[in-house]
Design a protein with these regions (language model features):
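Conserved tyrosine-mediated DNA breakage-rejoining catalytic core shared by Y-recombinases
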Residues: 3-4, 59-100
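Active-site/catalytic core of tyrosine-dependent DNA strand-transfer enzymes
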Residues: 22-23, 91-167
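Phosphate-coordinating loops and pocket residues in cytosolic domains that bind phosphorylated ligands
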Residues: 28, 59, 67, 208-212
Length: 237
């Protein structure tokens, strides 16, 4: 008989950022690290404001943004459930972030980002002059951001330093949980409202099959939650 070792419990399994000051700290540190980790810092910010999964965010395209309609399109092909095409409302805070992301194309090291046929919202850092006119590369999955593994410990360390808490826990997986937790608190546990932004398919049969609010109703829901992120500001040149 071989006794199996107990699996270590994931320290981030039941964690969400509930303290408004810690939320603001996360945003401040992300802004501070953006020049060093462009697109990676914004990826984490985007995850917080949309409650989207990282794998979904990395596949988002600039064309999925419709400022005129105020919607963010999520094709079923990139959704985890792959159930149907979905839309999220663009709140004022999310619009600020999206415009900040698009403004990364103004940086001298990312001239390719504004090219009409460069489709990815989060671009690769692995870019060279030889790839500038390589259309196949620009249109391929290789041109989008691959991951954030090196960024996570740097952001965590900066948050710990600024908070004075050496045990502060941070991982990107808590961002979706944070949005959902905040939504549940604001809407007094009404899961059918939270579900419209978290895009969970199965909370219960009633909510899945009969609760179908339109985009404007969901915009009201999302705007209420988004007021929590009042610290977000447009970047200056």
């Amino acid at each position: 008989f071989i006794k199996k070792e107990k699996r270590k419990e994931d320290p981030y399994k039941n964690i969400a950022i509930e303290d408004p000051k810690q939320l603001a700290l996360f945003w401040q540190c992300s802004e501070e690290l953006s020049p060093r980790f462009p697109f990676k810092a914004e990826l984490h910010q985007f995850m917080l404001l949309t409650a989207m999964r990282k794998t979904e965010c990395l596949k988002m395209e600039k064309a999925h943004i419709n400022f005129e309609k105020g919607t963010l399109f999520i094709p079923k092909g990139i959704s985890k459930t792959k159930y149907r095409d979905e839309e999220l409302p663009i709140t004022p805070e999310l619009e600020v972030l999206l415009r900040n992301i698009l403004d990364l194309g103004n940086r001298p090291d990312f001239p390719f980002y504004k090219m009409k046929d460069f489709r990815w919202l989060f671009a690769t850092r692995n870019w060279g002059a030889q790839k500038y006119f390589n259309k196949d590369f620009r249109l391929s999955h290789k041109a989008r951001l691959g991951g954030d593994e090196k960024y996570i410990p740097v952001l965590r360390a900066l948050m710990r330093e600024k908070s004075g808490d050496p045990d502060l826990l941070y991982a990107p997986k808590i961002l979706r949980k944070t949005y959902i937790t905040k939504s549940q608190q604001i809407f007094a546990g009404r899961s059918e409202i939270t579900q419209q932004m978290s895009r969970h398919r199965n909370i219960d049969v009633l909510n899945s099959h009969y609760n179908k609010p339109g985009i404007e109703t969901r915009r009201e829901y999302a705007s209420e939650v988004s007021k929590v992120f009042s610290f977000i500001q447009r970047r200056t040149a």
